[in-house]
Amino acid sequence: MSATPTPSDYLLLIRNNSWYQALTPSEIEEAMTRFTAWFEELNREGKVKSAAPLAAAGKTITSHTVTDGPFAESKEAIAGFFVVEAESLDEAVEIAKACPGLELGQTVEVRAFAVDPFENEKARITAAH
C-alpha cells in the first residue's frame, strides 16, 4: 500500500479470531479453501492493496501502562485486515459481503481512510465560527 491512502482505498477489519473453535479439522480446511479462493479472486481483480492476519495476542498501551491484550471478547477481536481499492463505499461493502468468514460468525467492518485526517475537526471548528 502506498504511504498515503487514496479516496478509493477502504479498510476491511475482519473480527472474531475464534471462528474455528467449534469446527472439525475438515470443516476448517474447507473454510480456509473458500477464504483463499475469495482472496485470490480479489487479487486477480486488482482489488487487494494489502492484507494480513493478526496474531491472537498483543499489547494494549495507555498513557501510563502496557498490558497484555486485547481484552475484547474473541468475537470482537480483530483477526485480520484487508485494504481494498473500490469505486465507492458501496462497492467496498459488496466486497466485504462476499467474505466467507461471515458464514462462520466473523464480521467485517468497512471504513474509508480519512484523506485529510483532521477534516472532521476542521469542519467542526469552521461551523462553530
Regions found by a protein language model. Name each.
Residues M1-H129:
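Conserved, structured core segments of small domains
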